[in-house]
Swiss-Prot record:
Compartmental location: Cytoplasm
Record's protein name: Phosphopantetheine adenylyltransferase
Disulphide linkage map: none
Molecular function per GO: ATP binding; dephospho-CoA kinase activity; pantetheine-phosphate adenylyltransferase activity
Family matches, as NCBIfam families: CoaD_Thcocales (NF041124), cyt_tran_rel (TIGR00125), PRK00777.1 (NF001985)
Keyword field contains Translocase: no
Gene: coaD
Organism: Pyrococcus abyssi (strain GE5 / Orsay)
Length: 157
């Protein structure tokens, strides 16, 4: 049920996995228009296994492919260079969709919005999705070669 006109979600979206997909699905479930902040190559330099993160253009292509396959049409993808991104420039945003892990980022966004006189966003939190190893599914574990994008352990030979 669409509750908001404009929602925002952000991330690196490297090697799209079940957690990313759940986050995006929730955003489209609650928002009429979804603004997606996609991190620039500069922004990901300090992430774990940064050298294995796919380049921005590839992550953008994979993200668009996922959106099209799922018939998500009402979106705008914007390159971001920091955690606040465009959230202080688009006054009409109403909500932000995050995981339990990225909840603190939503608080930073709201603080930044309030500092420039904008209304804070309603925060919608989705649970973290666990891998079959018991850890959360993360791009870092995928880049490390420990799990696949579905959370299955990768067998070493």
């Amino acid at each position: 049920m669409m509750k908001f006109k404009k929602v925002v979600v952000g991330g690196t979206f490297d090697r799209l996995h079940l957690g990313h997909k759940a986050l995006l699905r929730k955003a489209f479930e609650v928002g009429k228009i979804v603004y997606i902040g996609l991190t620039s190559d500069d922004m990901v330099k300090n992430k774990p296994y940064a050298e294995k993160i796919l380049p921005y253009e590839r992550r953008l292509k994979d993200l668009i492919e996922f959106l099209e396959v799922n018939n998500f049409r009402r979106y705008r993808i914007i390159k971001i260079n920091n955690a606040i991104g465009f959230t202080t420039r688009i006054r009409s945003l109403e909500a932000i969709v995050v995981s339990e892990e990225t909840y603190k980022g939503a608080l930073l966004v709201n603080r930044a919005r309030e500092e420039v006189g904008l209304r804070p966003l309603e925060i919608i939190v989705i649970p973290i999705i666990k891998s079959k190893l018991g850890d959360k599914i993360s791009s870092s574990l995928i880049r490390a070669g420990l799990i696949d994008p579905f959370g299955n352990p990768i067998k070493r030979e």
